[in-house]
Amino acid sequence: MFFAKTIENWTDWGAVYQDIPAFLPLARAIFAREGLLPIRETAHLTPGTNAVFRADDFVVKIFAPRESGLDAESDFRTEQAAIRRAESLGIATPKLRGAGFLEDKYRFYYLITGYIPGKEAGEWLKTADAVQKEQFCGWLWDTLRSWNTPCPDGVFRRDMAGYSLQNPRWQGISPAAEAHRRELLPSLTAMPEVCVHGDLTAENLLVPADGEPVVIDFADTVLAPACYELPPICFSLFDYDPGLARMFWKSPEPLADALLAGLLLHDFGANFMEEICGRFLGISPKALLRLEPVENFLRKRYG
């Protein structure tokens, strides 16, 4: 047995997922299985949902076992398929070096990718000059034109409008605002579904010292309208900077309209709405009677 900790629920996983020594015997067994050299050094990376750390020139991602309450196999297959799709489209992403599962105390799915040194894009943008920002935003727009295209059914989750009706995160807004949101959702179902990354946040794009930016963490890839990409980009990656959003947005459609649609659909749309209410509107999402205050904020800020 390589993993000695006990995982019976999400709290157990949360207590251990950043504990590299707890996962190191497991990682060494995985490296041996994949024919990679023994691990010499490890280092922490930005924490997420799963156990992720650097091991020499690789990044090891060990998915939470099903005993944690998370659907690890689905997340694993989604990310594996998305990485391969990105590679086939020529999108810069760490090369996949190993993928599978190891049956131990629990069944652990894993991915091994190459490690690419770089600065997280959210931090990099804070000190980038105007030319660098323009180039970055242009690169991101062009990359998404390639990525946000149709792909075969059955690979990624779809019908985000239908899922959004059941998404428990929306319980955090008032019943009146939620009723208004549900009035608007049917109009979004007619929008064409394409492949979306869904999590292009400040942490999930890396800017190397040389070369083009790199996209990481494809675990939230789904089929959805292209506007689904916008909330993480505008609210996390760009940190609500309308100047960056205007550099990026090259569609004739008003950005505010597309942003609102993406916000209503997104798996974490309720979290973004809560942030907008607290940071910019000075109200609780429980105090919203309808969505107009949020819509007006988006129109005023983004046009």
Regions picked out by a protein language model, each given a short descriptive name:
Residues 227-256, 262-293:
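Active-site activation/catalytic loop segments of kinase-like enzymes and analogous catalytic loops
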Residues 61-62, 97-98, 160, 195-198, ...:
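Short beta-strand segments
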Residues 19-34, 101, 132-138, 146-198, ...:
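An alpha-helical support segment within catalytic cores of ATP-dependent transferases
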Residues 41-155:
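ATP-binding pocket architecture of kinase catalytic cores
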Residues 46-56, 182-228:
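Active-site acidic catalytic loop and adjacent metal/ATP-binding pocket
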Residues 128-130, 214, 231-233:
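Glycine-rich, phosphate-binding/catalytic loops in enzymes
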